[in-house]
Amino acid sequence: MARSFGTAEFLFLLEAIPSTLLLSLGALAGGAIVGLFVAILRIVPSRPLRWLATGYIGLFQGTPVLMQLFVTYYGLAVLFRIQVDAWPAVLLAFSLYSGAFLGEIWRGSIEAIPRAQWEAAECLSLSFPKQLWYVILPQAARISIPPTVGFAVQLIKNTSIAAIIGFVELTRAGQLMTNTTFKPMIVYPIVAALYFILCWPLSLVAQTLERRIDAALGIKQHF
């Protein structure tokens, strides 16, 4: 028998927000580690390493994240012959997915640094790793902040895909509540509004940071 949608049902949806944010932060942290290595491999002198990074990016950017989630969830179970919980599978899948996109964002930020900065580092007789660490990466980090925050917004919304394997985040909570109340036209607009509340402030932060960095670099914006 269907039940009405009231305060308890709304609170159930709110209780799913922490798991959504935790998954997003975990995937962003894991993706940051992977993405940094990918970005560096994309610019190293070694051609095989550049090919490896390019292949990784092509694989994860060129396939649906849903398929990546399926392969991770069921692949781990088959490979290790164990029952895999949804949480580690989802976290791994989204970390690998995030790494491909963050790697390209950060590679572009590194390559945006003027060549004169590299030449100045070479004049100081710094090795390639030290050039990156002391000269290039600090400047690239500043440039990469707006697109990284923008990707974080997309990542929060993409975590809704985790509902397909039963991970209880905001979308899955909405599905469960719809199954008990039979009121999808009430539940899903509320879920959408909660996603908007989570993502809109980050979008504003990304736009503000982009304007400030463009102003610092002397780039004119056209509206």
Please annotate each region the language model reported.
Residues 1-223:
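Transmembrane alpha-helices and adjacent helix-loop boundaries
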